[in-house]
Amino acid sequence: MPFYVERLALEAGATQQSIVLHVTLLTGVYALMQLVFAPLWGRWSDRIGRRPLILIGLGGYVIAQVLFGLSTSLWLLYVARIVGGILSSATLPVSGAYVVDMTTKEERSRGMAWLGTAASLGVVVGPALGGLLSRQDWHLNWNAAHFKIDSFSLPFFAAALLGLLTLFAAWRWLPESLPNTLAQDAHLAKDRSEKTKSDWRTLLKTLFPLLALTLAGQFALTMFEGTFALFAQAKFDFGPVEVGYVFVVCGLVMTVFQAGAVGFLAGKISEMIQIGVGFALMGTGIALLATAQTKPLVFVFVALLSLGMAFIAPNLSALVSKRGGERQAGASLGIQNAANSLGQSVGPLLGGVLFIWQTNAPYLLSGAVLIALALGIAWKVVVKRRAAISTL
């Protein structure tokens, strides 16, 4: 996306600084839509079921990718991101709620790890495919009104095609995980309408510490994601293919360790300890990225921060679903997705501003925040264990 935005912005006469802001704004506006709509989709899935909202989310993703690929101006890119953010924000929280429906509490972390593994596989395939398809020697150039197809469009059309195939597979083979949902909703509609506000407040109060950690993790991750292409281009002269390779490494590390280590450790080491280790690894990797002087070190440090995120994401989702309760799994994970989205909105915007000020600043700040959180979690775990020992 950064290189696509850069091309359209340069055609519109934008400066290099405004290009940075457009890249981060386009990242942030998508997250802002998810911030607003993900909790609503999650709550709605508790009422009418998971399947229809997963289908809506996948359909919205397809529409957004097609619009993005056809865009010839920055304003069309913003329209595509807003539409995609609104509709596809149903996918993640409702998929998480689906996992909650299909697993026991003991299996929850493992289930969330496998869900994260599926998402990480997308991170592996997406950048590699995008880098290949955006090559300049495809000689594509078609224009009609406000729409255009060229080499930069192909990755988005490929994503739309994959999304369409997934939508068909879900429509054809995905069963509903909430039995008798519509009947339950009709019977409880009056009670729910009266209790909705208090339910939201109770959930927010119960989940607040976990939501704060979720926000911090996504803030740091998207500050990295939103500025990395610009950082790597400025410091190491990376192009789309090289940036794609870096994100392939990121996705591979998350895929392997979420499927392997996190699933294996589920039930053996508490979720909070794994989260603390994840913050320490991620913070160290991001901070060291600012000091990298060679291209191989970039890959090493990105792998380290990806390893940290592999521990953070599934364990946070598992804790949120447990503390929120199974009957409100959609609402709980929807609120968590809103916290994710808030971090995704603020991270790229602040990252863009810091990058304009000083190239390494986004990574030094986010690394310091994550390491401080890791130390705070470690202190809390130690205090809790001492209290437990003293009561024996």
What does each model-identified segment do?
Residues A90-T104, F311-G324:
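Intracellular juxtamembrane helix-capping segments at the cytosolic ends
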Residues V36-G49, F257-E271, F355:
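Helix-to-loop junctions at the C-terminal end of transmembrane segments
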Residues G49, L70-W75, L87, D237, ...:
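Helix-breaking motifs and short loop linkers at transmembrane-helix boundaries and internal kinks
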Residues L35-T72:
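Conserved MFS/SLC helix-loop-helix module at the cytosolic interface between two early adjacent transmembrane helices
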Residues F257, S270-L316:
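C-terminal transmembrane helical hairpin of 12-TM major facilitator-type secondary transporters
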Residues P175-A216:
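Juxtamembrane intracellular "pre-TM" segments in multi-pass secondary transporters
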Residues M1-V20, G226-E242:
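Short amphipathic helix-loop junctions that connect adjacent transmembrane helices
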Residues A160-A183, G376-V381:
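C-terminal membrane-cytosol helix-exit motif in multi-pass small-molecule transporters
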